[in-house]
A protein has these predicted regions:
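Eukaryotic polytopic
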Residues: 1-197
Length: 197
């Protein structure tokens, strides 16, 4: 199951990195309202401020994540081959460098993705925050219809679901750690009865 989850995640990262279904999108602020256009020149012509190439940032996150997810495999193969060919010190060094790249690179990727996705331009491009004129139950459909070529709904939705899953996993992990700590404390205080070692 873990391998299936890894391969599925890697496949979606590759799809969104190399064949992203969302079109080019530039975010800009015009008179206090966010808007999306396919080119930066359109925003400059309209006098927009806070101009950001949202699509390129989202694609960069997927590309970074794709290679970040492949790094454990590539690092393991490189370390294994160098060890197999009689240079175990180099294999150990490659394994250590790969582990450092996996840990540090993964943390930076995770943080940058949150910043890019949940800043105002990312939330607007993904349809989380829409102009005041789009109200009611179908505001996302109205948003997608208003920006048919530039909305980042698909990429933004994938990123939001990914972060929701990781936050839930972090919460469960913290909860289990606290529960284990409490059980250990209770056992240390009350668990030592007669005949215990």
């Amino acid at each position: 199951m873990c391998c299936g989850g890894y391969v599925t995640f890697l496949t979606f990262l590759g799809k969104y990195a190399y064949n992203n279904p969302d079109g080019p999108a530039w975010y800009g602020n015009i008179a206090g309202q966010g808007t999306l256009t396919p080119t930066e020149a359109d925003l400059i012509a309209q006098g927009a401020t806070d101009i950001v190439d949202v699509h390129s940032r989202f694609v960069a996150w997927f590309l970074w994540g794709f290679w970040q997810a492949l790094l454990p495999v590539l690092s393991g193969v490189a370390a294994g081959l160098t060890t197999a060919f009689g240079v175990p010190q180099l294999g150990a060094c490659l394994g250590g460098l790969g582990g450092c790249g996996i840990g540090c690179g993964g943390l930076f990727w995770w943080i940058y993705g949150m910043v890019w996705r949940f800043k105002p331009y990312g939330k607007f491009a993904a349809g989380d925050v829409v102009p005041d004129t789009f109200q009611g139950d179908d505001y996302k459909d109205t948003f997608i219809a208003a920006y048919p070529l530039t909305n980042q709904y698909s990429s933004g939705n994938f990123m939001a679901v990914y972060y929701l899953i990781t936050w839930i996993m972090l919460g469960v992990s913290c909860g289990c750690t606290i529960l284990g700590f409490l059980c250990t404390c209770l056992y240390a205080k009350f668990g030592k009865g007669e005949g215990s070692y």
